[in-house]
């Protein structure tokens, strides 16, 4: 009970401590309590860090720029004020980041695989999310979710995660929005061209879900969020599935795509 209370307080303070590159869901609605069972909270003694996604009973996938010292993970969370009976807390046993990632570039290979110190089991509010069998096509409708701000300019955080539908866009849209950024095949460009819906501060590391499959990881975006023609950039999970599966199988020297 003490741990649950501490987590609730940390989540309430998430805005004050969220890193600048974090993102949150703007323009969405309250998620159904059972549609985000794979969503994971990463936090430490200072507060909320990022989101993550449960892909295996022992493994969570998040963004590499979410890496921090001494963090924990909470699973099965919906309301920050009313804990679910099946919420679980885990520590990281091992963390894996692409060995060829550019250390001075948070946008490069923004993916991290975390092994839990103990497995978790499916429950009413905890479930795995499937890795993709194929990449999403331009125009696909996908779901984003998180406890991030629900305002593009003000720090207004909901008590429960919000969800929104956005579209996979052509890389040219993101190249135009982020001058100096070279879109790569290992990223996805996703959002709403007319604006109004977006991931934003606080949602970093969370999932982009298309047709029930885990297609993207929240990585990069504009602030304020939700501006027209300024979509978000997501790590393309499909291109890392071989690396992910190799690590889980025990090949810790596996290489990421270039």
Swiss-Prot record:
Q: List the disulfide bonds.
A: 50-66, 142-210, 174-189, 200-225
Q: Which residue ranges does the record assign to the Peptidase S1 domain?
A: 25-249
Q: Which residues are glycosylated?
A: 44
Which residue windows are transmembrane per the record? none
Q: Which Gene3D superfamilies match?
A: Trypsin-like serine proteases
What is this protein's function per UniProt? Snake venom serine protease that activates plasminogen. Weakly hydrolyzes the alpha chain of human fibrinogen without releasing fibrinopeptide A. Does not hydrolyze plasma kallikrein or factor Xa. Does not clot fibrinogen. Does not affect platelet function. Induces hypotensive effects on rats. Shows a preferential cleavage at Lys-|-Xaa over Arg-|-Xaa bonds.
Task: Give the GO molecular function terms.
Answer: serine-type endopeptidase activity; toxin activity
Q: In which tissues is it expressed?
A: Expressed by the venom gland.
Signal sequence extent: 1-18
Q: Does the keyword Protease apply?
A: yes
* Enzyme Commission no: 3.4.21.-
The entry's cellular-component GO terms read: extracellular region; secretory granule
* UniProt main location, coarse: secreted
Q: Propeptide positions, renumbered to this chain?
A: 19-24
Record bears the keyword NAD: no
Q: How is its activity regulated?
A: Inhibited by the serine protease inhibitors NPGB, PMSF, p-aminobenzamidine and aprotinin. Not inhibited by soybean trypsin inhibitor or EDTA.
**How would you classify this enzyme at the top EC level?**
hydrolase
GO BP field: proteolysis; regulation of blood pressure
Entry protein name: Venom plasminogen activator LV-PA
Subcellular locations according to the entry: Secreted
Alphabetically list the UniProt keywords: Disulfide bond, Fibrinolytic toxin, Glycoprotein, Hemostasis impairing toxin, Hydrolase, Hypotensive agent, Plasminogen activation, Protease, Secreted, Serine protease, Signal, Toxin
Name the family the entry cites. Answer: Belongs to the peptidase S1 family. Snake venom subfamily.
* Active site positions, chain numbering: 65 (charge relay system), 110 (charge relay system), 204 (charge relay system)
| Xref: PROSITE patterns | TRYPSIN_DOM, TRYPSIN_HIS, TRYPSIN_SER
What does the PTM comment of the record read?
A: N-glycosylated. PubMed:17034951 shows that it contains approximately 10% carbohydrates, PubMed:10871053 shows that it contains approximately 20% carbohydrates.
């Amino acid at each position: 009970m003490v741990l649950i209370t501490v987590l609730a307080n940390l989540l309430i303070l998430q805005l004050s401590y969220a890193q600048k590159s974090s993102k949150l869901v703007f323009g969405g609605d309250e998620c159904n309590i059972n549609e985000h069972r794979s969503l994971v909270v990463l936090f430490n003694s200072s507060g909320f860090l990022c989101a993550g996604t449960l892909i295996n009973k022992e493994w969570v996938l998040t963004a590499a720029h979410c890496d921090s010292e001494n963090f924990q993970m909470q699973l099965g969370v919906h309301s920050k004020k009313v804990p679910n009976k099946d919420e679980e807390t885990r520590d990281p046993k091992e963390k894996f980041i692409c060995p060829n990632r550019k250390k001075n570039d948070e946008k490069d290979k923004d993916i991290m695989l975390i092994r839990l110190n103990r497995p978790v089991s499916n429950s009413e509010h905890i479930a795995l999310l499937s890795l993709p069998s194929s990449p999403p096509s331009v125009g696909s409708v996908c779901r984003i979710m998180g406890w991030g701000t629900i305002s593009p300019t003000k720090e207004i955080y909901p008590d429960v995660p919000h969800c929104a539908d956005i579209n996979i866009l052509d890389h040219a849209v993101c190249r135009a929005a982020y001058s100096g950024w070279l879109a790569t095949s290992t990223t996805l460009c996703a959002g709403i061209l007319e604006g109004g819906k977006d991931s934003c501060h606080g949602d970093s590391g969370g999932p982009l879900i298309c047709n029930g499959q885990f297609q993207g990881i929240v990585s990069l975006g504009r602030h304020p969020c939700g501006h027209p023609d300024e979509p978000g950039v997501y790590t393309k999970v499909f291109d890392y599935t071989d690396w992910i599966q190799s690590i889980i199988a025990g090949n810790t020297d596996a290489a990421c795509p270039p």
